[in-house]
């Protein structure tokens, strides 16, 4: 397993709230919590930037992390990430923040310590572009947006 340096920015982590951990052996994501001073509401149509109390330093340029929504928040409450996905580059060392957007028509309450997003580590491939006049022919060619059919 790859080791990633994590800096605890909020002393409640490890005392009042656990470090992010994988829920099962098959879990891809680690839950991130709202580490605010008090509970708050996100009004309909509003976006808020929420601290998680953590910083990570991935260091390995072949890895990055993405902050993704928790499926239940979007499906049950209409609350999603304000930037859809957050990308954490391997050389970033600042605090992890979560942008939450309430796209529902009701206020959404966030309690201190609520799990609000998940962090997933992913491999990185940096591409080198090769300029060509034409691509090698494939069966699909330029077909997109529904090209492969519905059934």
Swiss-Prot record:
Transmembrane segments: none annotated. Pathway: Pyrimidine metabolism; dUMP biosynthesis; dUMP from dCTP (dUTP route): step 2/2. It holds the Pfam family dUTPase. GO terms for molecular function: dUTP diphosphatase activity; magnesium ion binding. Keywords: Hydrolase, Magnesium, Metal-binding, Nucleotide metabolism. SUPFAM superfamilies: dUTPase-like (SSF51283). Its EC number is 3.6.1.23. GO terms for biological process: dUMP biosynthetic process; dUTP catabolic process. Disulfide bonds: none annotated. InterPro entries: dUTPase, dUTPase-like, dUTPase-like_sf, dUTPase_trimeric. This enzyme is involved in nucleotide metabolism: it produces dUMP, the immediate precursor of thymidine nucleotides and it decreases the intracellular concentration of dUTP so that uracil cannot be incorporated into DNA. PANTHER family: DEOXYURIDINE 5'-TRIPHOSPHATE NUCLEOTIDOHYDROLASE (PTHR11241:SF0). Belongs to the dUTPase family. This is Deoxyuridine 5'-triphosphate nucleotidohydrolase. It comes from Actinobacillus succinogenes (strain ATCC 55618 / DSM 22257 / CCUG 43843 / 130Z).
């Amino acid at each position: 397993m790859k080791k990633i340096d994590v800096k605890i920015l909020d002393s409640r982590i490890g005392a009042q709230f656990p470090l992010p951990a994988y829920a099962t052996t098959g879990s891809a994501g680690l839950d991130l919590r709202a580490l605010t001073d008090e509970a708050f509401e996100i009004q309909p149509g509003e976006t808020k930037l929420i601290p998680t109390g953590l910083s990570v330093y991935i260091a390995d340029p072949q890895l990055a992390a993405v902050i993704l929504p928790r499926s239940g928040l979007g499906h049950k409450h209409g609350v999603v990430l304000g930037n859809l996905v957050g990308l954490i580059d391997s050389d970033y060392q600042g605090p992890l923040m979560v942008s939450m957007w309430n796209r529902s028509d009701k206020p959404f309450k966030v309690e201190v310590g609520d799990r609000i997003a998940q962090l997933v580590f992913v491999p990185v491939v940096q591409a080198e572009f090769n300029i060509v006049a034409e691509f090698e022919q494939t069966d699909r060619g330029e077909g997109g947006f529904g090209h492969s059919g519905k059934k």
